[in-house]
Amino acid sequence: MKTARIISATVMAAAALTACGSDDDDDHNAAPSSWIRQQYSAATTGSGYVDSADRIPAVAKEIDGNTSARDRISAADVELLRYRDDIVAVTPLAAGGSRIEIDDYRTGYNRWQTRIGSVWPDPASSAFRGGGPGEGK
């Protein structure tokens, strides 16, 4: 009987700890920076990384397939992938292919604000929940 109580208490404690875990959306949505560095070549001009063969939608789909973005904005000349603390932009290369650039959320938001509009939260507002533990929450 004593063993049953110990097992029962252990199971209940494990369930309670699991229920108190952090929000997966906040903790597990970092931009796949390491994967991007491994998958694509460093740009020889400008910044970021390049895929000299694939077009914007295919590259954005590859990145999103590796690590799902919180949200995505698509246009003819850019794909923006929103992650917890970063924005990944996929734009065309003049010679064909795509350029991939990773900005922290605030920099990316300011850079792409004309495309983002009011779709994503302004990092200066109280609605923004990025930036890591305890910030903006």
Predicted regions and their residues:
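Bacterial N-terminal signal peptides that target proteins for export
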Residues: M1-S8
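Low-complexity, glycine/proline/serine-enriched intrinsically disordered segments
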Residues: G21-K137
